[in-house]
């Protein structure tokens, strides 16, 4: 279930720099893990948040423009050395609606393939949408290296706080949720004949654009 974050080197060249990546034990991140990634200061790693939001009043046209803006921000950031993108829908309000996480992830993934910069960065999704195995599998399958389902964690916390779930502390319940979700994702991978989550990430980035 290990996944790697950072710039991928040339597969045809065996050099130490190709190993300079961040290893995660699984692609489902806690809020604390995501916060560490966002603040990463190690040489060779630079993270940036990209908003998955658009003005409600702008309608469908606003959604399209927001996606184009997202792609533009990513292109500029790559030129500045950013190699970890955190696609975030935090900040949703009556005025700002979220871009569907799968649309933003898949859209940016294929945009970067067209720009021939996909292997220079990793996509991490911070979203309130994913909560089930199917959601995680889709996001990973369409380009996300890791996912932070912050709303699922909030739901678990509220259920314990309100007494709907008893005899378990929050940290243990969260760990159980992540473990169960990962078992489901691994099962989805295995049904496709894929043995690791790393290879399932957009089918290895669409087999590196074929």
Predicted regions, residues:
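Extended, highly charged accessory segments
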Residues: 1-69, 75, 79, 86
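Conserved small/polar residues in nucleotide/adenosyl-binding loops
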Residues: 200-206
